[in-house]
């Protein structure tokens, strides 16, 4: 008589494929996952509580360290919340610089996902190509704000610095180059039979599951839900650009892959149009006091980050620090469907599924 015993395995918190200090406790029977329990909190720093003792401008660097692969969108959401409370009108040139910074950051973030996800399942070359192009974007953002990862660029009322001479032209040159490389990525990976066998039909969930788990971003759109805040609830100047929202139909790892790859192309369209419409001159920061005091009241805003819907709630008592601040962090919500996705899957698919959800632990733990 053959008898099998279930085994407990720890994936992380120091596993290279968890891309951060994330621990996953799995129970396996042979090679089949029976149960998966995420363990989070290793990177918790209490950002929201710390913010209660900081001035609004001082909070911005802390947002860089949540989703550190897409710091510009985090910068924007806190500024947008305060601006909403104050009723500020943002200068045109600042709006375009914000959009350019956020969309370049979105492309860079998706490049990290593409390269590392493929590296995790055994493809080394794409990782090198992805980081080659990402380095070009990081250099552009470095020229803009003097930092490579934690930018601290946005300000309540606009941005800290104007674009340096020749920067817009460099961004314009980058767009056709990136399109050419993107076509090469598809030639290299998207039609590869081995890759397709690893992602098609793996990690499937329904539209109903996605909505009930509060998923957002590509993790929601892969099921066929056409929802992107840049289109459905336009903020900043996104209503001035012509772009479409990629959606899937099956809700598997392949659909999540396709959605993000197509999002890179759509972000390139936005960048291209923003460069063409970029104002020749103008202020980059509205007239705001050095010490900002939001009026008494509360506000909630939400925007579309590379990982999904990031929100910021502020309650103000009229002082220079927020009375209460709360972030809706998309990675935290997207992570919650992982136990459902992994149950019954082969252990070989674990890393494929985890990489497809695309979490950032700085954002999960907050």
Swiss-Prot record:
<keyword id="KW-0813">Transport</keyword>
<dbReference type="InterPro" id="IPR022885">
    <property type="entry name" value="NDH1_su_D/H"/>
</dbReference>
<keyword id="KW-0520">NAD</keyword>
<dbReference type="GO" id="GO:0050136">
    <property type="term" value="F:NADH:ubiquinone reductase (non-electrogenic) activity"/>
</dbReference>
<keyword id="KW-1278">Translocase</keyword>
<comment type="similarity">
    <text>Belongs to the complex I 49 kDa subunit family.</text>
</comment>
<comment type="subunit">
    <text>NDH-1 is composed of 14 different subunits. Subunits NuoB, C, D, E, F, and G constitute the peripheral sector of the complex.</text>
</comment>
<dbReference type="InterPro" id="IPR001135">
    <property type="entry name" value="NADH_Q_OxRdtase_suD"/>
</dbReference>
<keyword id="KW-0874">Quinone</keyword>
<keyword id="KW-0472">Membrane</keyword>
<keyword id="KW-1003">Cell membrane</keyword>
<dbReference type="InterPro" id="IPR029014">
    <property type="entry name" value="NiFe-Hase_large"/>
</dbReference>
<dbReference type="GO" id="GO:0051287">
    <property type="term" value="F:NAD binding"/>
</dbReference>
<dbReference type="GO" id="GO:0048038">
    <property type="term" value="F:quinone binding"/>
</dbReference>
<protein>
    <recommendedName>
        <fullName>NADH-quinone oxidoreductase subunit D</fullName>
        <ecNumber>7.1.1.-</ecNumber>
    </recommendedName>
</protein>
<comment type="function">
    <text>NDH-1 shuttles electrons from NADH, via FMN and iron-sulfur (Fe-S) centers, to quinones in the respiratory chain. The immediate electron acceptor for the enzyme in this species is believed to be a menaquinone. Couples the redox reaction to proton translocation (for every two electrons transferred, four hydrogen ions are translocated across the cytoplasmic membrane), and thus conserves the redox energy in a proton gradient.</text>
</comment>
<dbReference type="GO" id="GO:0005886">
    <property type="term" value="C:plasma membrane"/>
</dbReference>
<dbReference type="Pfam" id="PF00346">
    <property type="entry name" value="Complex1_49kDa"/>
</dbReference>
